[in-house]
C-alpha cells in the first residue's frame, strides 16, 4: 500500500460509502448546494469499474435537464459572492456546478452543454499537471490547454479555480514512509528523523497558495478567487493562507447544503459511479430510505507490528474488510495498550 495508506484509504472509502446515505433536501433563503464532477466520457463509452469518478456525457446532460425541470437554479460563484455581500439574493434551489482537475473533457463535452443550457460552472486546475509535470496522482488523462482555459473563462460562464499547484499528491507523513495529503500533513524528514515545525508547515502552505494563484494568473490572466482542496482535505491554516492569496472561497468534499456565512469551506457532493438519472434524483431530493450507520471499532494495537511490512499488510487487510462489510463509520482506539490491561 503506497499512497496515503490507512489515512487516505479509510477517508476515501468512508467518504464514498457515507455519500450513499446522505439526505440532501434543503431550503432556500441563502442556502445553496454544490455538485462536483471530474472526467466526462463519451456517450458510447462504459465507465470502467476502476474509475468511479467518470460520468457519461448523456447522463450528465440528463442531470442538467432534470435540474431545469425540477426548479433548480444553477448559479455562478459571482452570484454567491454577491449574495454573501448583500448585493443580491440567491434564487430558490440555488446550486453550483464544479468540475475538478481541468480535463480536456470539460472543454469538449461539458462546455458545449453549459452553453446549451446557459449554466455557469467552476473548473479547478492543478498547476503542476497543466505545467506538463507528472506526479504520483497524475491520472494521465488529456487536459485543457491554456488557450482553451482562456476561452471558457472569457465566455462568462466559467469560473477558473485553483486546485493547488503541487498539492494534488501525497507527502511522507511518518517514519514508516506513508504518504498523506500534502495540504494537511506535517512533512516527515526521513534523513533527519523529524517532522516539519508549525512555522515550516505554515510557510509551505502559504507559498503553495501564492504559487498556485500566480501560476494561473501568469498563463490565463486571471486571479483565482476559489481554492478547491485536493481530496477535500483542508484546515484552518490552509483556509487562511488561501484567503491571503486572494481566494476567499474554498471548497471541500463533504456532503450537505451550504450557507452564505461559510464560504471558506463550501460543501460539495461528489457524483460517483455514473449514477443515472433515478439515483441522481434521489440524491437531489433526499427521498431515499434512511439507512443505518454501520460501525466498526478499530484497535490501533492490532494494526501495529514491529515489522513495518507486517504493519502494511495489517492495514491493507483491515481496509479491505471495511470495504467488504460496507462499513461507513470507523471509531479508532487511538491510544496504545500493549499489555492489554486497559490502562
Show the residue positions of the predicted features.
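Alpha-helical scaffolding within the catalytic cores
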Residues: 80-83, 106-110, 137-153, 172-174, ...
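Catalytic domains of carbohydrate-active enzymes, especially glycoside hydrolases
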Residues: 55-75, 121, 313-338
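Metal-dependent polysaccharide deacetylase catalytic core of the NodB/CE4 family, i.e.
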Residues: 30, 35, 40-41, 93-95, ...
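Bacterial N-terminal signal peptides
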Residues: 11-22
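Conserved beta-strand positions in the central sheet of alpha/beta enzyme cores
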Residues: 34-36, 76, 161, 228, ...
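Bacterial N-terminal signal peptides that target proteins for export
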Residues: 2-13
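Aromatic-lined substrate-binding rim segments of carbohydrate-active enzymes
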Residues: 89-92, 100, 105-115, 318-319, ...
Amino acid at each position: 500500500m503506497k499512497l496515503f495508506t490507512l489515512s487516505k484509504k479509510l477517508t476515501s472509502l468512508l467518504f464514498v460509502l457515507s455519500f450513499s446515505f446522505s439526505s440532501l433536501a434543503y431550503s432556500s433563503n441563502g442556502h445553496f448546494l454544490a455538485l462536483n464532477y471530474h472526467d466526462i466520457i463519451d456517450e458510447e463509452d462504459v465507465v470502467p469499474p476502476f474509475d468511479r469518478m467518470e460520468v457519461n456525457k448523456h447522463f450528465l446532460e440528463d442531470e442538467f435537464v432534470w435540474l431545469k425541470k425540477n426548479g433548480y437554479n444553477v448559479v455562478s460563484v459571482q452570484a454567491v459572492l454577491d449574495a454573501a455581500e448583500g448585493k443580491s439574493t440567491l434564487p430558490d434551489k440555488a446550486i453550483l456546478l464544479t468540475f475538478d482537475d481541468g480535463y480536456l473533457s470539460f472543454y469538449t463535452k461539458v462546455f458545449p452543454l453549459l452553453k446549451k443550457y446557459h449554466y455557469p460552472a467552476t473548473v479547478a486546475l492543478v498547476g503542476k499537471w497543466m505545467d506538463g509535470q507528472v506526479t504520483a496522482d497524475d491520472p494521465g488523462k488529456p487536459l485543457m490547454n491554456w488557450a482553451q482555459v482562456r476561452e471558457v473563462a472569457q465566455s462568462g460562464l466559467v469560473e477558473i479555480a485553483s486546485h493547488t499547484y503541487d498539492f494534488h499528491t501525497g507527502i511522507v507523513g511518518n517514519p514508516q514512509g506513508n504518504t498523506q495529503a500534502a495540504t494537511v500533513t506535517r512533512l516527515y524528514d526521513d534523513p533527519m528523523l523529524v517532522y516539519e515545525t508549525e512555522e515550516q508547515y505554515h510557510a509551505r502552505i502559504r507559498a503553495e497558495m501564492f504559487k498556485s494563484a500566480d501560476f494561473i494568473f501568469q498563463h490565463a490572466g486571471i486571479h483565482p478567487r476559489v481554492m478547491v482542496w485536493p481530496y477535500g482535505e483542508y484546515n484552518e491554516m490552509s483556509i487562511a493562507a488561501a484567503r491571503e492569496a486572494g481566494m476567499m472561497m474554498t471548497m471541500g468534499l463533504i456532503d450537505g447544503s451550504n450557507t452564505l456565512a461559510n464560504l471558506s469551506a463550501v460543501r460539495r457532493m461528489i457524483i460517483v459511479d455514473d449514477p443515472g438519472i433515478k439515483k441522481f434524483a434521489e440524491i437531489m431530493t433526499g427521498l431515499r430510505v434512511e439507512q443505518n450507520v454501520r460501525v466498526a471499532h478499530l484497535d490501533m494495537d492490532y494494526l501495529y507490528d514491529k515489522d513495518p511490512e507486517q504493519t502494511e499488510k495489517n492495514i491493507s487487510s483491515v481496509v479491505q474488510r471495511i470495504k467488504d462489510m460496507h462499513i461507513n463509520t470507523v471509531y479508532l482506539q487511538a491510544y496504545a495498550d500493549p499489555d492489554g490491561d486497559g490502562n
